[in-house]
Amino acid sequence: MNEKKPKPRRLAYGVDPKRPQRYSLRQARYDALAHDIDALAAEAARQGRRLSVLDIGAGGGASPLHLRARPNFAAIDLDGADRDRQYNVDESLYRRFFIADLTEGCPELASESYDVVICEQVLEHIHELRKPMETIGRLVKPGGKAFVGVPIFLPPLHLARRHLVPRLDRLVRSTRRRDHVQAFTLASVKAALLAYSKLSFVEARGFRIISGGILRPLEERRAWWAFNRWLGARIPAACIEVQIVLEKPAASQKA
């Protein structure tokens, strides 16, 4: 009698165990940044150098899973950082892993030491944004880039999330823990990043206007992913999540 072989584990984009859908819209942000960083690594390799990348607020380590599947990962020196080890991230995914608190400015990390800084799904958990955003800008080398991703609301829904939801929680005596302490719009997070990081705006791209539920089966189809990427590039402010790409002017531009 033949035993049934277990089905292989389904991974988002072939690499990410967080979601089983092949083209998961929730994980699309990591696929997008991996695509761009891989292109930067290819350019660095052509110039005979390596690309230094920092994944700050690394969480469960989604970024390296997507990056290491790319053809130019061998040209990347990838470091990770988080305030503690609560997520039990596989530190072997990184060249080095730092215990460093973004809210304290990450003094362990040298200024202008990374070609790329990734800060995905971190800032919405932080009350005071000035120092974390200043730190992102401080760590990027001249000519380097930052990829900053947060959930956002379409105005005026951010006001409901900020003011009405806490009142309703108190009214119904909800015990639900809400980890998000910020209610960003695209305009508000972009303005704060430009003011505090001192980096220049490159682009904003949105992910997921509507997803999950009865639409989740569509996330097995590349065409649905492509449509959402197209839509998110054109109306990022209407999306549930946004990724803002920033750049530090090269030293020659500052002169």
Specify the residue positions occupied by each region the protein language model found.
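A short beta-strand submotif of the Rossmann-like class I SAM-dependent methyltransferase core
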Residues: 116-122
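S-adenosyl-L-methionine-dependent methyltransferase catalytic module, highlighting the catalytic core
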Residues: 8-23, 27, 127-137, 145-250
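Residue-level signal for short amphipathic helical patches enriched in basic/charged
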Residues: 48, 124, 184
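Conserved short hydrophobic patches within well-ordered secondary structure
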Residues: 93-95, 121, 183, 210-211
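Short linear motifs at secondary-structure transitions and domain/linker junctions
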Residues: 28, 51-57, 70-76, 91-94, ...
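Conserved N-terminal segment of class I S-adenosyl-L-methionine
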Residues: 1-112, 116, 133, 206-207, ...
